[in-house]
C-alpha cells in the first residue's frame, strides 16, 4: 500500500518545491543535510516539472527498496518505515544509503502501533461474535 507521506514508506517522492524566485527544488527537509542538497538547477521559466524526474536526487527517491541500505532492506519493518525520512538517513561519508538516525525509535513506534491495532481489532471481533 502506498505511503500517504514521504516521512515513512517506500512510495516514490511526489513533490517538489517552487521557491519564490521560480527555482524548482527538492523538498525543504533536505536543507538539513548539507549545503545545496535540495538544489536541482531547474526553474519554472525554462523547465517542465517532469524534467525534475531526471535529476539524480529525485530519481534516487523513485527507486523504493532498491535505494535503501542493506540493513534496511533486510529489516522486517522496511515496508512500513521505508528507511525513515530521507533527510534522516544522510551521513557525510555514505550519503543517504543508511538507516534513519531514528531507526530504533521508528521500530519501537511501529511495533507499538501494530500491537495496539492488533489488540483493538481482536477486541472488536470478540464483541461482534
Model regions: which residues?
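C-terminal accessory region of radical SAM enzymes
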Residues: 1, 29-74
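Short glycine-/small-residue motifs
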Residues: 26-27, 83
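Long, K/E/R/D-enriched contiguous segments that form extended
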Residues: 1-7
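Acidic surface patches and DE-rich sequence motifs
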Residues: 19
